[in-house]
């Protein structure tokens, strides 16, 4: 617990500095590097893919996909990236079809393209018109949901939510996470409303963000938990003391970030 608190005390200021102060290109590069590390964790740390070239291709692809989000590039560039990536992966399979299985390529697609594209929503949100004002929304939702679920589960948890996938999660904890995320978004909306009087803030949409985001975060958490369960590992890495690896700390954001991006475009909380 002490390591977790110390790590959080360091990470939170760094997060605020990165998202609110640092130039957008620096934030994009740092996020892209973290996604590349997360790709390595999913492939190598799980033991599912140990072929060095496949891991290298996936890590480079993860970085490139994330940076594509920053440059707001044409879809044609993403298509070319995917084309080259696909060719490289299947070339590896053709050179050694006995050891390189289709399951390995499928995981390379998920870790090298799908996850970075979804998590790249953070970079795309930062690039929006009110990006500096709304970039913290995915983090607020994920943090409040995780914290609310933890403390509510600790205090009131009796009924298991997903005993096979994640035995420690409870229905009571999930409800606490939903409530905490909604309260957190109301507070965040109030801060924006008071801090930026010219900005129009929709409190109803803030509640919607909290509710939907918390549900998405819990699902994202379970997605990465089932991979750890199947591969028999406790953590994806040890990059962050007390928290594990990149995927251990930011697992819920895989679902929260793209959902928040979609909601910000379809039902803007701030104008």
Where are these regions (language model features)?
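C-terminal-most transmembrane helix of multi-pass membrane proteins
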Residues: 256-257
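Transmembrane alpha-helix interface/packing and boundary motifs in multi-pass membrane proteins
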Residues: 212-217
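Membrane-embedded alpha-helical bundles of polytopic integral membrane proteins
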Residues: 1-211
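Interfacial loop-to-transmembrane junctions
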Residues: 229-252
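Juxtamembrane boundary at the C-terminal end of a transmembrane helix
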Residues: 262-271
